[in-house]
Amino acid sequence: AGWVGGVTAGDWGGPLGVGVCGVGADDDAVTEAWLAGLGRESFVSIEPFFAAGSRGYAVTPQPVHIELYPRVTTQPPILPADAGPLRTAFWSLAVRWYAWRASSVPGRAPPNIRLFVRYHAPGRAAVLPHSRGLAKGLVGVVHAYAGRGHEGTNAVVIAHELLHTLGATDKYDPVDLMPQWPDG
């Protein structure tokens, strides 16, 4: 089942359904207005990115299909910055449980991958919390800014976490801890 396992290239007989659920990270009016008007067009750059990246591999020409799912009003579990391995394992289980419950829509098939995008009002925080994508459970929690001017940056973060749900890992230079080019 998707809530336990992951995706392999053999699973790609067709596009993987990616359900994006908007979540308000704050009570700001800007965030609320953004969520009220959120549409699939906010994510249109992600599908071509994956299509271009899949050329030359034995997967479908359109590897992902982004679908907007209803807004979620309950917050996903938050992983504390100082969480150790045990706390992280419990958080992972809690996120999978949350994803299963929060993205269930009567009469609609569940997506293969669930991404919960927590929108924050611009200007409230200089740095957003870390976003995370889990291969086990095919779920991600993404932190993004509300507003059209942030759609490009948000798409990069969403695509990055989506890659993590598919098993990609970050690669960092051990000396300067910067991402390794082009693999990181």
Question: Where on the chain are the PLM-derived regions?
Answer:
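Active-site scaffold of zinc-dependent metalloenzymes
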Residues: 118-152
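The catalytic-center signature of Zn2+-dependent metalloproteases
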Residues: 141-184
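Extracytoplasmic/secreted envelope proteins and their assembly/folding machinery
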Residues: 40-43, 47, 139, 156-160
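Propeptide-to-catalytic entry region of secreted or membrane-anchored zinc metalloproteases
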Residues: 2-108, 119
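Loop/turn elements at helix/coil->beta-strand transitions in domains of secreted/extracellular proteins
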Residues: 16-19, 109-114, 136-140
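Short intrinsically disordered, low-complexity coil segments enriched in acidic
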Residues: 2-4, 130, 167
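Extracytoplasmic/periplasmic, Sec-exported soluble proteins
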Residues: 30-42, 134, 146-155
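Short acidic alpha-helical/loop segments enriched in Asp/Glu that coordinate divalent cations
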Residues: 61-62, 127-131, 174-178
